[in-house]
Amino acid sequence: MSVQGIEGVLQQLQVTALQASGSAKTLPAEAGFASELKAAIGKISENQQTARTLAQNFELGVPGVGINDVMVNMQKSSVSLQLGIQVRNKLVAAYQDVMNMGV
């Protein structure tokens, strides 16, 4: 028997043992497209809030906040927003394509 065959059998035995002991990982109920989309929108919002806060701190003259940090965070926020808009546009186009399909 080859090493790969033994490793495959060993892996199957480990999975079976985990399932039998009841400690097998279960997927969260909300694992899917909706949760990923929600997380991405949350990240976009977080990027915008961070950039806004950093810009305000720079305007107020808070020590340790440089113009380069502000500009990088503003660009990061802008790029993530543009990406979100493009994803939304693709989703709308895909939805319209599905709705225009004949049955």
From Swiss-Prot:
Pfam families: FliE. Its main location: other. InterPro entries: FliE (IPR001624). This is Flagellar hook-basal body complex protein FliE. It comes from the Bacteria. One of its GO terms (cellular component) is bacterial-type flagellum basal body. Coiled coil: none annotated. GO terms for biological process: bacterial-type flagellum-dependent cell motility. It is found in: Bacterial flagellum basal body. Belongs to the FliE family. The gene is fliE. Keywords: Bacterial flagellum. GO terms for molecular function: cytoskeletal motor activity; structural molecule activity.
